[in-house]
Amino acid sequence: MNKKEHILIVGAGLCGSLLALRMAQRGFKITLVEKRPDLRKSDISAGRSINLAFSNRGIKGISLVGLTKKTEPLCIPMNGRMIHDKTGETFFSPYSGNKSEYINSISRTDLNALLLNEVEKLPNAEIIFQQDCKDVDLKSAKAVFEHFETKKKTELSGDILIGTDGAGSVVRQSMEADSDMNFRVSEYFLEHGYKELSIPAGKTEKYRIFKNALHIWPRGENMLIALPNLDGSFTVTLFMSYKKGEQNFEQLKSEKSIKAYFEEFYPDALEQMPDLIKDFSQNPTSPLGTVKCSPWNVQGKSLLMGDSAHAIVPFYGQGMNASFEDVVVFDEVLDDFEGNWQQIFDEYEKRRKKDTDAIGDLAIDNFHEMKEHTAAPVFQQKRKLETAFEQEFPDEFASKYRLVTFREQIGYNQAMQRGRAQDKAILKLLENNELSDSLGLKEKLEKVNQATKKMLDGTFS
């Protein structure tokens, strides 16, 4: 493989920027093309999530490019979920019994800007903004772009082309339109959408609610969440059905209806949201979708990566982390198979596909768990037990969440299989009152491990 080879990357979001940086560090010539303006110079959020959950799998990607120290000041640790009930009472549920394991809230814009700055420092990389991809020649790694303002068309090419252009990927649509490919794609959208709102920084206390947690207001069919920002504000997201159910976005059209809804379901949050009506009226309602597709490449010339290959809903906080892990896996495959792009692309998909399918499924599972079950007594009982196991026996037990979020050395698929079996085992044992207080914690763990093994073997009844 000639390190002078030219890689054309379509999409300069988080995945594309990290990929461009790593490939440039490896010596490839990089052209990174983005349809939006430079986010370092203008606000282009357009309803996209302002901050993101950043955890071990994503940190692995940042470590690969040597940016761990530069990323740390951008992070706010979140040690667990703070559950808010309708009366304003709270219940803190740690993410792990191990206090050194936590997730971070990080600004999408700050992290993306850091990556773009690092790409620009390298002489073998260039970034071109405001170029909207209109057409892709997948078999020759060429693409036609149209300037956002002038509408002038430009053709760019590389030795290979990688599409990191997000859930609505033009590169993926080109694969879907190619009748020679036998391309398969599924797009599944929830009946729910989301709307970004805010809790501003306080005047006396900087943070109006507890800083180091992901706040959740679970309300059955709908829910509110909040993540902290460095300036003391919180990014609040309302997840709600578009039209179905007793409460939905369609019903919340007037100032009166919006306020009445929040007074009934989120009274303690409403007290901290002076800009609710303005935010609700001005910010878009955005869809929540999962994309799965295959194959990810065309003849060793074009490849999909990140959300363009496997968009997921945000309920495991793994979208960015999964995309960053894509770059890590791709980098490992390059080490193993350098010299043949077809072999590299095929091997990359072989190693990655089952894991990205798994996190897509897990994210939908977690959506239902967060909005419906986090407030349920049996769920809280289960979490207390899991936390106790992790505190006392950290090497012998890991909850599903811990397997997915903090055990980055195992794949999402393995984490899902083990975690689902373990969840079913614990809930079944609790329902049958087989984990009574008369048992010691070690005995309870042995029962859980035995039941989990039977679940995995298909012999648990």
Say what each PLM segment does.
Residues 2-13:
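Beta1/beta-strand and adjacent pyrophosphate-binding region of the FAD-binding site
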Residues 7-9, 30, 302:
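Conserved hydrophobic helix-helix packing surfaces used for dimerization/oligomerization
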Residues 15, 38, 168:
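Conserved Rossmann-like nucleotide-cofactor binding loop
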Residues 24-47:
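Glycine-rich FAD pyrophosphate-binding loop
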Residues 42-118:
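Active-site-adjacent segment of FAD-dependent monooxygenases/related oxidoreductases
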Residues 117, 122, 131-135, 140-288, ...:
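Conserved FAD-binding catalytic core of PHBH/FMO-like flavoproteins
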Residues 332-461:
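C-terminal helical "tail/cap" subdomain of flavin- and related membrane-associated enzymes
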